[in-house]
């Protein structure tokens, strides 16, 4: 290591140490307690978001349901799209199973085994009632969305995809778990072809263009209801209705991993308007259930009308085993091979009951979006014109002023190619404090409280590392959505903020403050001649 490298490392160490001493040490005495941080006093503008104080107090009070938030120095947690925290009732369900009813299911005839089996099957009924589907036999328990999509992909490729011209549509917005299984099955089984759904510049599916592409060869459409990066809520009711109108034989799969914690499904109601999905995939740990839990809703017509093979082979799925051939049970049990994660499934039932209680108030989504709007309000207050809110797409024939071009992404509809985030926009000036966010909320589009942000002058790793010093948890990287970053944003990675109903107004203010402070600190380090 040469002298220059040593000097750079020493300078970086001194700056980080100074930053820690100046910003963090004093905060430990004041913030990292169970007393909610109050934030600095701001001169607030008239457009500050507001909501009924009774709603705020209700959701502040439910934090007492979560042991995670009762610990000293509880982290300020905004990575809820990665996983959610678990209420005490969910944790107690796991503990009670192992304390008092630990036994296997669908096997023993003794009392605690029968009880375990009954309780396990009762969760199937809880799920069926919560999403209001026709039968509990349409509910298959899984370890999560990744397993669920792989299982569904395997079933579909065997039953539906017959030749190399059969089309499977996904989008650039998908989680890798809804991309790679299709790629690998097509490659290994040498049938089917993968196609991509047209998108608008704001990250919503271009329904008109998509429906025009559908033909008799289109067999599968597999899309997320909500992007785990953008938070956009796709209009799946309209999408499904138009797909089925053009080709009723198409199987529509909805990845509900990000939507299920925030939005309510009513399958029977959707079915009345021909807007219901054929398959719905969820992940338990995203909606306050334990890791290793989830479920897939599959219409009976896909599993009961013709022979269906198991995804995995083994115990608990057979009716008869002969020397060279075996006979299998029907759905849903044919897809629940081996010993299941019983305690996690029981606790998932408890989590759904908890969600039902929260949703009965009718304000969870409203409150989350209030926090989202409040966060952006504070971020605008701190960063002022350094905050760039994308997408900005003017109406056709609207003149673009050069000064406005420097603070917003302004692209005429006729001049935008397949890349969303253009290099000429990225490099338009030398504003090293500039932070980009993707916020379709400002255009009155439907979304959940997820916000990606990034800078061209430091990495998401830099931002998230320094926020971690402040006891703040947000996500960095590509968030398992590689195509979205590479083919839609045209950037390598981003930071992601995701809000849940147990977050507070004080937390979102503190988060905005610290993002601004960290941005200025990183800019200062860069300005002194050393790249971060």
UniProtKB/Swiss-Prot annotation:
Query: Which InterPro entries does the protein's record reference?
Result: Aminotrans_V_dom (IPR000192), PyrdxlP-dep_Trfase (IPR015424), PyrdxlP-dep_Trfase_major (IPR015421), PyrdxlP-dep_Trfase_small (IPR015422)
Give an example GO cellular component term for this record.
apicoplast
Q: Which residues form the active site?
A: 480
Q: Where in the cell is it found?
A: Plastid, Apicoplast
Q: Which reaction does it catalyse?
A: (sulfur carrier)-H + L-cysteine = (sulfur carrier)-SH + L-alanine
Write the Enzyme Commission number(s) for this entry: 2.8.1.7
Q: Which GO terms describe its molecular function?
A: transferase activity
Similarity field:
Belongs to the class-V pyridoxal-phosphate-dependent aminotransferase family. Csd subfamily.
Residue numbers carrying N6-(pyridoxal phosphate)lysine? 286
Q: What name appears for this protein in its UniProt entry?
A: Putative cysteine desulfurase PbSufS
Q: Which organism is it from?
A: Plasmodium berghei (strain Anka)
* Class of this enzyme: transferase
Please list the cofactors this protein needs: pyridoxal 5'-phosphate
User: What happens without the gene?
Assistant: Essential for blood-stage parasite survival. Conditional knockout in the mosquito stages does not affect the number of oocysts and development of midgut- and salivary gland-associated sporozoites up to day 14 post-infection. On day 22 post-infection, fewer oocysts show sporulation and the number of salivary gland sporozoites is reduced.
What keywords does the record list, in alphabetical order?
Apicoplast, Plastid, Pyridoxal phosphate, Signal, Transferase
Q: Which residues form the signal peptide?
A: 1-18
Instruction: Please spell out the taxonomic lineage of the organism that makes this protein.
Output: Eukaryota, Sar, Alveolata, Apicomplexa, Aconoidasida
Q: How does it assemble?
A: Monomer. Interacts with SufE; interaction enhances cysteine desulfurase activity of SufS.
* Known pathway: Cofactor biosynthesis; iron-sulfur cluster biosynthesis
One Pfam match, given by its short name, reads Aminotran_5
Query: What is the role of this chain?
Result: Catalyzes sulfur activation and mobilization in sulfur mobilization (SUF) pathway for iron-sulfur (Fe-S) cluster biogenesis. Active when in complex with a partner protein SufE. Required for apicoplast maintenance. Plays a role in the development of sporozoites in oocysts in mosquitoes.
């Amino acid at each position: 290591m040469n002298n220059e490298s040593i000097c750079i490392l020493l300078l970086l160490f001194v700056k980080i140490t100074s930053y820690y001493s100046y910003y963090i040490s004093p905060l430990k005495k004041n913030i990292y307690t169970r007393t909610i941080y109050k934030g600095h006093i701001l001169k607030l503008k008239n457009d500050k978001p507001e909501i009924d104080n009774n709603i705020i107090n209700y959701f502040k009070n439910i934090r007492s349901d979560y042991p995670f938030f009762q610990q000293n120095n509880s982290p300020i947690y905004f990575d809820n799209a990665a996983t959610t925290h678990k209420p005490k009732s969910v944790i107690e369900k796991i503990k009670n199973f192992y304390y008092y009813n630990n036994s296997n299911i669908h096997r023993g005839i003794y009392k605690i085994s029968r009880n375990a089996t009954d309780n396990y099957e009762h969760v199937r009924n809880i799920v069926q009632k919560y999403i209001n589907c026709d039968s509990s036999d349409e509910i298959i328990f899984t370890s999560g969305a990744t397993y669920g999509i792989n299982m569904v992909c395997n079933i579909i490729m065997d039953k539906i995809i017959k030749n190399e011209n059969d089309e499977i549509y996904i989008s650039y917005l998908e989680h890798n778990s809804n991309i790679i299984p299709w790629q690998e099955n097509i490659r290994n089984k040498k049938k089917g072809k993968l196609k991509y759904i047209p998108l608008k510049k704001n990250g919503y599916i271009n329904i008109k263009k998509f429906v025009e592409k559908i033909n008799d060869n289109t067999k599968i459409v597999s899309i997320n209801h909500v992007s785990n990066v953008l938070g956009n809520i796709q209009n799946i009711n309209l999408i499904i209705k138009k797909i089925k109108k053009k080709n009723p034989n198409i199987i529509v799969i909805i990845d509900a991993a990000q939507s299920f914690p925030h939005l309510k499904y009513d399958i029977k109601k959707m079915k009345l308007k021909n807007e219901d999905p054929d398959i719905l995939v969820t992940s338990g740990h995203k909606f306050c259930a334990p890791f290793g839990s989830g479920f897939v809703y599959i219409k009976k017509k896909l599993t009961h009308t013709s022979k269906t093979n198991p995804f995995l082979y083994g115990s608990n799925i057979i009716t008869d085993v002969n020397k060279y051939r075996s006979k299998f049970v029907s759905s849903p049990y044919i897809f629940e091979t081996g010993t299941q994660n019983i305690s996690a499934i029981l606790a998932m039932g408890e989590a759904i009951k908890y969600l039902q209680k929260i949703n009965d108030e009718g304000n969870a989504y409203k409150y989350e979006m209030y926090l989202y709007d409040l966060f952006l309000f504070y971020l605008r207050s701190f960063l002022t014109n350094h905050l760039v809110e994308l997408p900005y797409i003017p109406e056709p024939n609207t003149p673009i002023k050069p000064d406005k071009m420097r603070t917003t992404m302004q692209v005429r509809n006729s001049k935008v190619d397949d890349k969303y985030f253009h290099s000429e926009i990225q490099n338009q000036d030398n504003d090293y404090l500039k932070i980009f966010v993707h916020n379709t909320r400002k255009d009155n589009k439907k979304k959940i409280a997820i916000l990606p942000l990034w800078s061209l002058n430091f990495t998401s790793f830099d931002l998230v590392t320094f926020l971690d010093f402040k006891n703040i948890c947000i996500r960095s990287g590509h968030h398992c959505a590689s195509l979205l970053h590479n083919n839609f944003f045209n950037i390598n990675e981003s930071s992601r903020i995701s809000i849940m109903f147990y977050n507070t107004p004080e937390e979102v203010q503190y988060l905005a403050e610290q993002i601004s402070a960290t941005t200025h600190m990183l800019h200062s380090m860069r300005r002194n001649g050393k790249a971060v």
